[in-house]
């Protein structure tokens, strides 16, 4: 069990093609863990990381906010703040300038909510209000992730060998299938037990 835990804690399943072609949906990617095998403060531009993302659950709301406030999503980043809020509210915090662009920074106050692990590449490392943040993007995506990611959100870093991420193709599809079609697994188990029950009753 310990061996299985150690193995599973060093792999992550790629669930989309946002990092295509270096990683594809269904790949199993080999990672190292923050705080144990690397210091998240040492993450730099070009690293592929796994971070705890809030934005996937608010993606459509963020698009509406950008539209209502006449914001350009290509130059907008959100810092998510969880708390005892009933609904999401947004306020402008300021602006940062990088070598690549200028970004308007907004704070999104949200109710306590789950996060989703996202495997994307760091494209910039910035300072804002005396804190270090990362701007992150999927290689195959036209735009950066809308969330300005703090150091504490970085959980894993993809292991790279000779410039290529260490992946095992297709193995992750089993995990994806079980998550997306869990109800079929439950149905199969119920049918199996019902069959055995009825079969036993006829004896």
Curated annotation (Swiss-Prot):
Major localization class: membrane
Protein name (Swiss-Prot/TrEMBL): Uncharacterized protein MJ0260
Highest classification ranks of the organism: Archaea, Methanobacteriati, Methanobacteriota, Methanomada group, Methanococci
CDD domains per record: S26_SPase_I
Keyword Transmembrane included in the entry's annotation: yes
GO biological process assignments: signal peptide processing
Lipid bilayer topology: Single-pass membrane protein
Single GO molecular function: serine-type endopeptidase activity
One of the record's GO cellular component terms: membrane
KW Ion transport (keyword) present: no
Lineage: superkingdom: Archaea
Keywords: Membrane, Transmembrane, Transmembrane helix
UniProt-listed InterPro entries: LexA/Signal_pep-like_sf, Peptidase_S26, Peptidase_S26B
Subcellular localization, as worded in the UniProt entry: Membrane
Provenance organism: Methanocaldococcus jannaschii (strain ATCC 43067 / DSM 2661 / JAL-1 / JCM 10045 / NBRC 100440) (Methanococcus jannaschii)
Transmembrane segments: 171-191
């Amino acid at each position: 069990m310990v061996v299985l835990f150690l193995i599973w804690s060093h792999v992550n399943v790629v669930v989309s093609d946002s990092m295509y072609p270096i990683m594809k949906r269904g790949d199993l990617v080999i990672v190292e863990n923050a705080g144990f095998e690397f210091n998240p403060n040492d993450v730099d531009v070009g690293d592929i990381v796994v971070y705890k993302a809030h934005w996937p659950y608010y993606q459509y709301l963020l698009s509406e906010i950008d539209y209502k406030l006449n914001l350009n999503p290509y130059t907008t980043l959100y810092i998510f703040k969880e708390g005892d809020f009933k609904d999401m509210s947004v306020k402008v915090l300021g602006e940062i300038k990088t070598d690549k662009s200028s970004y308007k920074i907004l704070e999104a106050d949200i109710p306590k909510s789950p996060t989703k692990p996202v495997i994307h590449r760091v494209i910039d490392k910035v300072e804002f209000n005396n804190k270090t943040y990362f701007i992150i993007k999927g290689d195959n995506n036209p735009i950066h992730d809308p969330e300005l990611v703090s150091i504490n959100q970085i959980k894993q870093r993809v292991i790279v060998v000779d410039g290529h991420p260490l992946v095992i193709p297709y193995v992750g599809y089993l995990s994806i299938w079980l998550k997306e079609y869990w109800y079929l697994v439950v149905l199969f188990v119920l049918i199996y037990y019902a069959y055995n029950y009825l079969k036993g009753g006829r004896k």
